[in-house]
Amino acid sequence: LPEMSFEFVQSGSHLIPVDQSLVYSNQPTWNYMVAPGRAWNESGDQGFSRASFPFALIERNQNCVHNGVMTFLFNDTTISNVRYQVTQETCMYFKFDMWGQLKAAYTPSQVANAEAVTAAHFDWLKNQLPTKPISVLASDYPNAKVNETLMSSGTTPEHTTTFGVFYNGVNYISNCNTRHGKYAYCSEMRLPSYSTAKSVLAGMAYMRLGQ
């Protein structure tokens, strides 16, 4: 893994990274991104809080993304080792599982724009597209005779992470699958666009020329 540095704001159970953009590391293979996670308490953690958050390794100069989760314990002054697991990727040519435990350092501090970061996070949550499991699409539109199994029939299950349909203002999505179960932060999974970006770019360029 590249050396990583994160700054978080906690609001209740929400663990919000201050920077959620692509971070360019000094490591030759991987850049990375992080996304909002959760913090909670468990009775056996001896006064520590427990946290987890999704992160993504992005292959440098490529579209390959490996999605994972990090977890650790913390209190007001210190942090445990960080455990991580990566069991999903978006490319056929570079598939692997990665897991381990790393030393971490924790510096308590006041985040200068904490209120703005928190407000932006909850505003983002409030304005997300309505989402439903794709399994209810057929019951939402019984006259359409939707057959969910046909939607992914042309793909290989072990190479399919997720799929969905956006219809009538609702985002119907499948589970986000990994080789070891469902991804805990499905809405935060980073998925590259590949040829979609190239197709949209051309259309947008023509639209701008038309204006």
Where are the predicted features?
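Short, solvent-exposed loop/turn and secondary-structure capping segments
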Residues: R83, N175-N177, A205-M207
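Aromatic-enriched hydrophobic runs in primary sequence
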Residues: H121, F163, H180-C186, R190, ...
